[in-house]
């Protein structure tokens, strides 16, 4: 599979995850759903930037889990990692009820900081 087809496939998987997670958020407020969507979008950008790291040998990934996964399973580990991370984030947020907006806001802030940092050092999202 070519890199462009892989990215297209992973985008479709993320869109499906967004839709499924938002459908199952029956007891969630509009704010909760919006924060989850923002988190998913930021994680998608972070995933694409992380994939860009492995196309440029002058960069390196700071996350040891992703590095070990790529070393053992190849570049397809990156999207799998982010899909699992998003799923885990949804499962945790679903259990938090009153703390949900705080949790989702915190994870969004962390993801935004990573995306901004990656952008500043020159990583692209491959669009």
Description of each model-found segment:
Residues 3-14:
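Bacterial N-terminal signal peptides that target proteins for export
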Residues 13-22:
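Sec-dependent N-terminal signal peptides
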Residues 26-127:
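Hydrophobic alpha-helical membrane segments
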């Amino acid at each position: 599979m070519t890199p462009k087809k892989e990215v297209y496939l992973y985008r479709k998987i993320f869109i499906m995850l967004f839709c499924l997670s938002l459908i199952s958020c029956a007891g969630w407020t509009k704010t909760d759903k919006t924060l989850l969507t923002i988190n998913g979008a930021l994680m998608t950008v972070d995933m694409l930037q992380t994939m860009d790291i492995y196309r440029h040998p002058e960069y390196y990934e700071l996350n040891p889990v992703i590095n070990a996964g790529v070393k053992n399973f190849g570049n397809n580990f990156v999207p799998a990692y982010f899909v699992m991370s998003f799923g885990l984030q949804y499962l945790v947020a679903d259990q938090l009820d009153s703390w949900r907006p705080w949790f989702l806001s915190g994870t969004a802030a962390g993801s935004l900081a990573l995306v901004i940092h990656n952008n500043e050092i020159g990583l692209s999202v491959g669009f």
